[in-house]
Amino acid sequence: MSITSKVRQSVVLAADGQVQALVAGSAANITKANIMTIYAQASAADAEIKLYNEIGDAKTASALIFHGKFGTAANEIMEFNLPGAGIYANTGIYADVTNCDFFYIVGTF
């Protein structure tokens, strides 16, 4: 029996930027995805992650698809597990991170 899965991990980000995946050994923007898990480590208290369904750093309010806050100190780990099929992004995923050492998503893309 074989198992076929499209669940993957994004490239780890340590600052604001476009969420990417490795494709044939090179990083490429994720354009369509079902985000199932968001994983991060705080670099200080009051860490935040905002994900936008867009390419580029416009941070359009209407494109905000996720806003998570966590942490009371540095080095705290947070895992946001999203129910069902997760959050769908169909344009791209731009991440705005505050007080995070790193973050990545797990999903289908």
Where are these regions (language model features)?
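Exposed aromatic-hydrophobic patches
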Residues: I77-A85
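Noncatalytic modules at the cell exterior or secretory-pathway interfaces
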Residues: M36-I38, A85-N99
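Short, surface-exposed beta-strand/strand-loop-strand elements in extracellular ectodomains
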Residues: A44-L64, Y104-G107
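Short proline/glycine- and polar residue-rich coil/turn motifs
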Residues: K69-E76
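Surface-exposed coil/turn segments at beta-strand junctions on protein surfaces, enriched
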Residues: T31, A73, G86-Y88
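Residues on the solvent-exposed faces and adjacent turns
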Residues: A42, N53, V97-N99
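C-terminal interaction-tip segments
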Residues: M1-T31, D96-F109
